[in-house]
Amino acid sequence: LVGSEMCIRDRNTVGTYIHTYDDRTYEEKKHSILATDIYSAIRGKKYSFIGEGIYEKKFTNSKLSAGIRHQQSLTENKYAGTSSAETRMQEAHTSTYIEYSSKIKRFNYSVGVQGSRSWFNQEGEGYQKYSVLPRIRLTYNFSDQAFIRYQGQISRSTPALSDLSNVEQLIDSLQIRRGNPTLKMSTVYNNTLNVDFRKGLFSSSLYLLYQYQHKPNMEETFREGELFVRTTANQRSWQKLNPEVEIKVGPIKDILSLSISTGINYFDSRGHNYHHTYTNWYYCASATAAYKKWSAYFEIRNHRNDFYGETLSYGENYHLLSVSYRYKQLNVGVMSLNPFGSNYRIGSENFSPLAPSKNWMYIKESSRVFALTLSWNFSFGRKYESAERRLHNEDNNAGTLKSGK
């Protein structure tokens, strides 16, 4: 190792306070007579802290990096209404890693290991887990125009606080949602392969993802008396296979650029009392044109869906068109969302054989929407080169058990 440069690359601390105020009313009527009346009120407070730091030391042809991250939170929730309960949950996650990267001619490699501790407590129940997790990245550059890269990593997935609550919430006259404080962490095996090729105006890439989760925290539905209980448990396994191809051309005559990507999502979800497979084909295409002071952009994509447990979540299906004109530092344009469509919808479908359901949200206002855009670019004073932001920590999980479907 010849020559070195040492620095603390990034530091980031975030403190969060989340106040939950959630009321829900549900009624069922039969021949105008009230048959079911459910009211739930949730009041909650969550305090959390996240701190992270990254250290790097660069050598002539290699780099050594290390980091540490700590997250801790306290959550207090009160449930009132048709059913009442109080919860007080504490959790902490600490992880540290070390990674070494280098290159040998056309071959680049990176190996690392992460050590972590996860802890959760709710009225004496919970878990404490220590883990040692490896990761690797291998890249081979065939030339300046083509390369192949493999990345592999083992990680842990912690249960959501909302699923760990020792609480029950009525959904309707036949269903109840129940938390599970005995949930344990699951193991995630992640593998990705990238192949890129570029020549002239043409570029293409092949992406392949395979992910396997062992004992994932997935939903479970069973019958208890006259009610169907929806809860979360450590199930058997979950797998995802995702090949994707992207092709780009341009800019043609420094005016037109075209891009299209398409892929398949295949899911295999295995629970203790269910097994589902699902395949989804998706695409996204876009075109960008720029001539003198005019520019235009068009994008279209279909549903890219996700399947987890027994629930199919539908992605967005939309198209977008925009045209703009630039005069000095002023940019004026018009944009339209779904100008050639009649309706916009997103939703989900549950395939439980005991209590299947469908949920759709229709937003007609999101079709044939037109908007004017206006921007003014200005700068003054000294200019500084901005550094890449590598750390982005946030906590947006309130830790409350939802009562809706």
Region annotations inferred by a language model:
Residues 22-32, 76-85, 121-130, 161-169, ...:
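Outer-membrane beta-barrel translocator domains and adjoining extracellular loop/strand segments
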Residues 325-405:
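C-terminal beta-signal and adjacent terminal beta-strands/loops
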Residues 1-8:
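Short, small-residue-biased leader/transition segments that mark boundaries at the very start
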Residues 13-21, 66-72, 111-117, 150-154, ...:
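Transmembrane beta-barrel strands of outer-membrane/channel proteins
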Residues 38-50, 89, 178-180, 184, ...:
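Outer membrane beta-barrel strand-and-loop segments of large Gram-negative receptors
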